[in-house]
Amino acid sequence: MATLLRSLALFKRNKDKPPITSGSGGAIRGIKHIIIVPIPGDSSITTRSRLLDRLVRLIGNPDVSGPKLTGALIGILSLFVESPGQLIQRITDDPDVSIRLLEVVQSDQSQSGLTFASRGTNMEDEADQYFSHDDPSSSDQPRFGWFENKEISDIEVQDPEGFNMILGTILAQIWVLLAKAVTAPDTAADSELRRWIKYTQQRRVVGEFRLERKWLDVVRNRIAEDLSLRRFMVALIQDIKRTPGNKPRIAEMICDIDTYIVEAGLASFILTIKFGIETMYPALGLHEFAGELSTLESLMNLYQQMGETAPYMVILENSIQNKFSAGSYPLLWSYAMGVGVELENSMGGLNFGRSYFDPAYFRLGQEMVRRSAGKVSSTLASELGITAEDARLVSEIAMHTTEDRISRAVGPRQAQVSFLHGDQSENELPRWEGKEDMRVKQSRGEARESYRETGPSRASDARAAHLPTDTPLDIDTASEPSQDPQDSRRSAEALLRLQAMAGISEEQGSDTDTPRVYNDRDLLE
């Protein structure tokens, strides 16, 4: 049996192992298309600001082709470094494209104010054609800018500090688009607006240079459809991270935005580890989780072997990303989601609409959190040197904190996944009722009758007398012995009023016919 287990572990390890690169075969190259990237040909701030202005207008032109749009975006993304040409040549290794760099300098003879640097050749007409400069004699009204502030006609400046602020503002809006351009483009607007507000408050961007939504939609769509552009952006992020010492302010801002970009599309894998394994609840000992725990262990090893590109596997369209989907460990993922919605309010808006979602293990995670509230891990306590007395104190404080958090019910709570309606009385589900459930309902019914006959104060005494001692107390209805007697009496009276009102509404709703609504218990039949 020990040999079988060793063979199984070796099999799982080799199954999820990435392919080993061999030096015998050559690299597979695809059919390349040419991308022209304009870069400044001198160190003048005027040249850079004028090039930035022309590229922003070029991107907003709806008639621009895809490769030309990619080249313009790469040109803007590399404008913040001293030598954009060297940066692009150093980090670009794409089998699908061939990048051609065109140096741009100032010109008084062209309509765009720029021309391509050449030796004795007049390139003003070609530069005007590339930048699609509007003819002043044309009857169509030219579009001067793509900013929400219509008073901004151009962004040409002479001051390096002002240029860096304008460039940083535009780059921040472009980089934020990468976070959800591939995984959730339809719901990206809200998160992008939050990032914009954050950087505006931090004075990293200038609010007046907020780009129009149409312009941002064009860039987001291009990022989503062009893998070569995403490869360049990821390579630029990694190159910035490898840079030692202090980095330029724009580079630090890009690293800050990278925290929202990494692990995009890997939420199921990361959250399963966070809520399913790191919480270390005893439910992990179930036999049903044994195989999936082994799968997760292999995936974590594979993630480490992939190196620095692992967090970007979805953005880079790496085929190995399918191994990390929740369909490879559905039971453990469903359990982890149940734990997550109980521990964090931010998990309440997560979409669980998956074919492999298991409601039973989702409720297992919920109940594991509820019943383990206030308990201290003995293993962790021994490692931290926590005494038994300290553990009891922590448990008592944690119980009060948990009750207070649940009673306030702050934020969205998707833990309430089942809803019982008026036509679904408790008698319709007899096989789900145990002895304890019958005793609790009997005690609640007697408490309601006592409230109607004797009033609030005597009803609370009747409720306390009829409540079974072996029945688990509900944290929403039970009071702690250490509470103030007046507070306990008021809480009991308020709860009894609500229960009495609920009983009256159930009696009134039993006479009306409503369509049958299935709850999550029916899913398990």
UniProtKB/Swiss-Prot annotation:
Q: Where is this motif: Nuclear export signal?
A: 425-440
Which stretches does UniProt call biased (Basic and acidic residues)? 428-452
Q: What is its main location?
A: virion
**Pfam families registered for this protein in UniProt:** Paramyxo_ncap
Region Ntail: start and end of each range?
404-525
Q: Which residues cross the membrane?
A: none
Q: How is it modified after translation?
A: Phosphorylation at Thr-279 is required for the formation of the nucleocapsid.
Residues with Phosphothreonine modification: T279
Region Homomultimerization, as annotated, extends over 1-36, 373-391
Molecular function in Gene Ontology = RNA binding; structural molecule activity
Q: Cite the residue spans of the region called Ncore.
A: 1-403
List every stretch annotated Disordered. Answer: 418-525
Q: Where is this region: RNA packaging and organization of the helical nucleocapsid?
A: 1-375
What does this protein do, in the record's words?
Forms the helical nucleocapsid (NC) in a ratio of 1 N per 6 ribonucleotides, protecting the genome from nucleases. The nucleocapsid (NC) has a helical structure with either 12.35 or 11.64 N per turn, approximately 20 nm in diameter, with a hollow central cavity approximately 5 nm in diameter. The encapsidated genomic RNA serves as template for transcription and replication; encapsidation by N is coupled to RNA synthesis. Forms the encapsidation complex with the phosphoprotein protein P. Before encapsidation, the newly synthesized free N protein, so-called N0, is chaperoned by P.
| Similarity-based family | Belongs to the paramyxoviruses nucleocapsid family.
Q: How does it assemble?
A: Homomultimer; forms the nucleocapsid. Binds to viral genomic RNA. N0 interacts (via Ncore) with the phosphoprotein (via N-terminus); this interaction allows P to chaperon N0 to avoid N polymerization and non-specific RNA binding before encapsidation. Interacts (via the Ntail) as N-RNA template with the phosphoprotein (via C-terminus XD); this interaction maintains the P/L complex anchored to the nucleocapsid template during the sequential transcription.
**What's said on domains?**
Ncore is globular and carries regions required for N self-assembly and RNA-binding. Ntail is an intrinsically disordered monomeric domain in the C-terminus.
Q: Which protein is depicted? A: Nucleoprotein
